[in-house]
Each structure stands twice: as C-alpha cells, then as structure tokens.
Amino acid sequence: MRSVTPLIDSVADLWDSHAAPPADDLLAQLLYASHLLGANRAVANFGGGNTSAKGTALDHTGRAVPVMWVKGSGSDLATMGAEHFTGLRLDEVLPLVGREAMSDGEMVAYLARCQLDPAMPRCSIETLLHAFVPAPHVHHTHPDGINVLAGTADGERLVRECFGDSAAWIPYIRPGFTLSVQVGDAFDQGRDASLVEISCRDSRSAATRCA
C-alpha cells in the first residue's frame, strides 16, 4: 500500500504541567499558553491570533472584580510579555451582548473605559469575541491546517466531516461586533465548551478553542 505524506504536520500538545505557572496565577498561565501557541508558526503567524482568560483581579479601589485578560493590539504571541495583556472589567463588558449593533470606533472607545488601567494596551476589535464566549480560556489562532481545510470551495462540508457537530461554521464576516455576537451565539447553542469553532474568511480562516 502506498504511503501518503501529510501536507501539514500534526500539532503537538506542548503544555507541561511541571513547567506551567500555578493555576492561581491566571495571567502567568495565559502568558505561558500564548508563548506555546506563538512558537509554532503553523498555528499562529507573526502578530496573528489572540488569547484570553477570565477570572478575578483587584481594581483601583482594591476590590476583587470579575476580569478578562486579553492580548492587546500590536503584540506577538511568541514574544509578548505580561505587560502586553489588557485587563477588562467583565461586569461592564458583558452588557454589550444585548446591543444590536456597534461600530468599531464605538467598540474600541467603550472597551477603553472598561480597562483596569487606562495605560494598558489598546484592545483589538476581536476582544468581544473572547468576552462573549462563555468559557474561562479562549485561544483564537489561524492554523495552517484550518486555513487549508476551510479555505477550499467545499470547506463547510469538509469542516463538518472532520469536526462534526462540535464545530460551528460562520460564513465570512468582517471582524468586529457582529462576528463576536455570532461566535458567542454559536457557543451558547448547546455545544461543548471545549469545541473548535471554525470561521471561514474567504482564503483565510480562524479557529477558536475554548476550555
């Protein structure tokens, strides 16, 4: 039988529980995961992708409040430091789920007012995608394997064949408020929170994995 050489190498799980920061250090764990993802350019191209984690942190008054740490604009997963994440007060962000529409400018301005510290990096237009997904950890990347699969003419059928009902297919829509709502809705429709979400972007696609 003729052997077949895969066009895309499989992606190894590099998480090392001994090397990873303790679970109670949420930001350090997020940075560790981000570096692992960014180290493989077949998973996250330079400057592409973003990661987030939800938990609690102290605000400027010293109160513990629900927050989401998310990669800020202009940083790279492989080389970023903890200072490149932005902390957002979730109790101020989540009410946006009820809005019907929001421009990019309105969204960026609103999120700036939700930051724990105004000196933190500016949020990307994909920040609400992370906030609206009901999972504590969200890793959003552009892996080569998903690009090849979802970017074909028959991409939707192939994605469903590979991932079954655990995958949500969202036809191309420009990143921003509407896409964030659609992704959040896809996760709310009875799917397991560890699913892979596929978003087709013409010749580009994105995979969002949650846990």
List the predicted regions and their residue ranges.
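Glycine-rich flexible loops
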Residues: 1-211
